[in-house]
Swiss-Prot record:
Protein localization: Nucleus
Family: Belongs to the Mediator complex subunit 11 family.
Annotated source species: Candida glabrata (strain ATCC 2001 / BCRC 20586 / JCM 3761 / NBRC 0622 / NRRL Y-65 / CBS 138) (Yeast)
Main localization of the protein described in the UniProt heading: nucleus
Protein name, UniProt field: Mediator of RNA polymerase II transcription subunit 11
Oligomer and partners: Component of the Mediator complex.
Signal peptide: none
An annotated GO BP: regulation of transcription by RNA polymerase II
Amino acid sequence: MSKSTLEQPEYVKERLESLAEVDRQLCSMLQEASQVAFTYGEVLRGNAMMKPQFQEHVSAFYSTLDNASGKLKKEIELLDENVGNRLLPINVNKKALGQDDDKLKEQMETLKEFLKTDNEETSTS
């Protein structure tokens, strides 16, 4: 730890650690996205054995995305609650909070339908 990190109040340290965890999750999510793209390409090339890995990577991607967005939302709420008390006044734009949940659910349903349709086509072939 740097000297400046040691001098930070405990609340700030906790927030920084939490944001570092969100950052790690987002990096993990990018790795999963890379694996999704690779395995999807393999499935498209006819490598049906890669389909379970594709499904696992997609599931892990969305799970990590859900977890990271939840933690980030919590940090935004904590920031909003503590503005003026522990932190200098700032403007937190709340317009977009919660809108992505509906889109995420819609994408999950689309993916399930895609995989279900693809499974049916594979089993009838």
